[in-house]
Amino acid sequence: LEDLQRGAFVDAYDIPPQAGSTGYDGAKAWEKEPSGTVTDQAGGDVIPLAITEAYQDRNLWWQPDHGGAEIVSAGQKTDGGNTYDVLTVTPKDGKPLEAWFDSKSHLLYRTVEMNSVQKLITTYSDYAAVDGAQIAKKLVIDDGSGNLQTLTLTSAKFSEALPLTAYRKPAEDLHDF
């Protein structure tokens, strides 16, 4: 769930027997753990990371002012025989990341960012048009542990903006497994 105007979001997962979510309402970040415990997330680089995620969700690098981010060319890089235009993007009050764009299609191919002390490499593929926007249907996340996390988008739609209350920290719902 993403608010493309205000940058708020909720990322939820439901992989039985566990479910949880994280969110950012534009000012505060929170996490709902599988136990149902809900906590504010404000330590370390949590808020700058949330700001950077909101920046990416809204594709602000395509705006005339780049959404207020500092953008520096890191040249071209190749991977699998393809060439990518690489930018170092630092959103205002966010964390820097490398964004790799396919030099032919200009679609986002990869992001490289530091999440606290962990380097995350996310690869985007299988783009499809949704209401005129190209959306990656497959994301592969490499956190360096040797295990890859693959996310597959099964449906997407654009709708009217929800009130910011939709992105606020939810109530606790404590339970045992």
How should each PLM-predicted stretch be described?
Residues 1-2, 22-26, 39-48, 101, ...:
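Short amphipathic beta-strand/extended segments with alternating polar/hydrophobic composition
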Residues 1-37, 67-73, 78, 91:
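N-terminal mature ectodomain segment of secretory-pathway/periplasmic proteins
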Residues 30-59:
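Acidic/charged, solvent-exposed loop-and-adjacent secondary-structure segments enriched in E/D, K/R, S/T
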Residues 58, 74, 132-135:
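A general structural signal for short secondary-structure boundary/capping elements
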Residues 60-74, 118-121:
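A short, amphipathic edge element
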Residues 80-173:
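Gly/Pro-enriched, hydrophobic low-complexity segments
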